[in-house]
Amino acid sequence: MKHSEKYSSFYRLRVNPWVSMFIAFLILLVISPLITQGIFTLYPSVSAGDYPLFSSARLLLPSALTITGILVWARTMDKLSLKDLGLTQKKVFVSWVIGSLCGAGLIAVVLAGLILLGAAHLSWGGVSSAASILLGALVYAVRGLSEEIVFRGYLLNVMSSRWGMVAGILVNSVLFAAAHIFNVGFSIVAFINLFLVGTVLASLYWLSANVWLVSAVHAAWNFTLGIILGGAVSGTTQPVHLLTLHTEQGNWLITGGSFGIEGSLSCFIVLVAVRAVLWRRVVHRYSITSPFPQR
């Protein structure tokens, strides 16, 4: 399927985009967490950690429910196939490898900038179990996939089909950033950076029409930052990590403060540069001259 054909195919969407946004957020932020909480409330021994394998499933269940809910809604209400949502069956493994390298590389560049500024350094984190690292990779992979199916696979297409690609990317990225508003240490810089992350992922999606690739970038970014480097991922730190990231205290604008380096000036600079490169390719690929859809 050509990119132009994929973009135009979404004009047949049947559901109002505002309804689609409401349902998607309801599934992501309310229904999936509540079902998970209900299940583990009924089985307190699992929540208490008597069964480590099932206890670990608590980290994966909300994302699995979100993926299932969105796919069922998109298929039932909008008659969209997996391919329509960017879940192509071709080169899935290759897409994950390339995306993972890109995601890890981006966060490495952000960290390098902070180290050069003397605002960060690393120390050994003392991980005791390789299984914990692998579990962390799995959790971030499934979470990344669930968020990308929601934001890029479904919502981006819904918004772009009704409001045009440019407006779709902008609104989608604002919602993506706003979804993190209650995270620890959230700031205006963090919002701007997450908005830029959204535009980068959206641009990459329109260039590839491949949710696997975009999900891998998202997952590898979080995994590298949280599990490998031991930094806060959007305000959340992990108990198990390979290294420990130390940032200069008192200069939150440079380091991102308690939100983590995703809210840092270094991250802003890297994202602006990457976004500029990708957006030029999007404009060239789709010959964009207007922010509104050309029907």
Over which residues does each language-model region extend?
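N-terminal, membrane-interfacial amphipathic/helix-forming hydrophobic leader that caps
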Residues: 1-82, 226-295
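Membrane-interface helix/loop boundary segments of multi-pass membrane proteins
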Residues: 7, 146-171, 203-210
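Juxtamembrane helix-loop-helix connectors linking adjacent transmembrane helices
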Residues: 35-58, 79-149, 156-161, 291-295
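Transmembrane alpha-helical core residues of multi-pass small-molecule transporters
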Residues: 62, 175-176, 193, 217-222
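Small-polar-interrupted transmembrane alpha-helices in polytopic inner-membrane proteins
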Residues: 107-110, 140, 164-181, 194-198
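Membrane-interface helix caps and helix-loop-helix hairpins in membrane proteins
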Residues: 119-126, 179-188
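Alpha-helical transmembrane segments of multi-pass membrane proteins
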Residues: 132, 136, 149, 191-202
